[in-house]
Amino acid sequence: LRGAKIPKKGEQEMKGVITEIERFSLKDGPGIRTTVFFKGCNMACKWCHNPETLSVKPQLMVYPKNCIGCGACVKACKAGARTIENGMLHYDRSVCTDCGACAQNCFTGALVMSGKEMTVEEVMSEILQDRGYYRNSGGGVTLSGGEVSTQPEFAVELLKALKNENISTAIETNLYAPWSVYESLMPFVDLVMFDIKVFDSSAHKKWTGVSNQRILENAKRIADSGKPYLVRTPVIPGVNDNEEEIGNIAEYVGGLGGAQYYELLLFNPLGESKYDALQVKNDFAGTRPTKTEGAERLEQVAKRKSGLPVRVG
């Protein structure tokens, strides 16, 4: 895991690092949901459409088109990362400390901090605003990311607070954490949504930075636990958007037994601006989602190989 220290259980006023709390989500589990996005990830998928969630540290995101050149950020920056030269605003990320002072003084949206330290109480105060919607729609709260398992102690405490309020819970995870982490989460989770991104182990390591052995082992444990679960695969052009790869994953998922359904998630190009804002390389710049006919073909393969209901999103 890259970045700041993860809060430990028992420390005074435990805090987690959260990138966003999205209300009225319809895609992160059943019913109307609030999705809490944890910052930090233990994988490095080259196609990630949320690159701001990879590091657990709060980070500055820069959107030059929103800048009006007022200079307020220059005055606020103590590191000298922001200067005005020949009437033009310049930013040197190499000396930036991501303290957030410039963003606090920017009112145009040119400078935005991604990631905020929050207590369980602070997160719950936002969640509880919509508890009536959860109850009436069969919804609840989903912990996502980044990767929820990179802040396990905070996740457990938040899940406990949710269950104390009789709110349905779900997690979205890559399943790459040690099984002991999931054992600590499972008593407070009603639904597990996990990814199997690539079936071939060497290809998985090439594209995500890690082997998939632990992921497949954890998937079997989730299935054997009896906990409700579903499986997703992001369909990435040039990586796994072919019948062989999707077929292999689907066959494995079907063999686990008990999955509610299998979902193919088409590549999302909307993260390109985030790479620019972070000033980091985007290996999938210009990539577009699999075309409709290709997606339909993969859907049929997934249905045939898994024996499960298949959704495409």
Regions found by a protein language model. Name each.
Residues 29-30, 37, 50, 54-55, ...:
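N-terminal-biased segments
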Residues 46-53, 72-91, 101-117:
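Iron-sulfur cluster-binding cysteine motifs and their immediate structural context
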Residues 73, 168, 228, 308-309:
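Residue-level detector of anion-binding/catalytic polar loops
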Residues 98, 163, 223, 303-304:
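Anion (oxyanion) recognition and catalysis
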Residues 121-277:
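Conserved AdoMet/S-adenosylmethionine-binding subsite of the radical SAM
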